[in-house]
């Protein structure tokens, strides 16, 4: 069910970005709504404020590297659990938590920069609303994941998991990897296209 939802979600986002907007711009006369309409993406609309769109390099690329690294540190922690290597498990989880919180810090900085220096706000038309909704919703899920990782880390410190019994650890790990994969899709669709 979740896979179908996210396939539909990203498919719809891809459709809007790559099919609807060009069609409205008159690339296909059958879909043209207004003869003189020219689409521009990103756009604030005809009466929206001017803004600078967010680029893919800089903080977004750094955040992508941070999340991918956090997936690797979490996998390394999992290997430590399976080998009953508690120091590897705990260090890997701690690094993953630090990387997740760092991602959130950079995202907060990116939002502040967008609002104060780029003019990119929630009121900046469809682009601004879409940008903040998609990245903010993902940031919320990263926050939930970081909290769950902290709970699992506390349980690991108390010795609650073994190589044979660690369902909660695996559930949180799957969630975290899912958040990583969703970010890759967002990075491509929101920042590159």
What would you call each of these model-derived segments?
Residues 1-193:
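...captures the hydrophobic TM-helix bundle architecture rather than a specific catalytic motif
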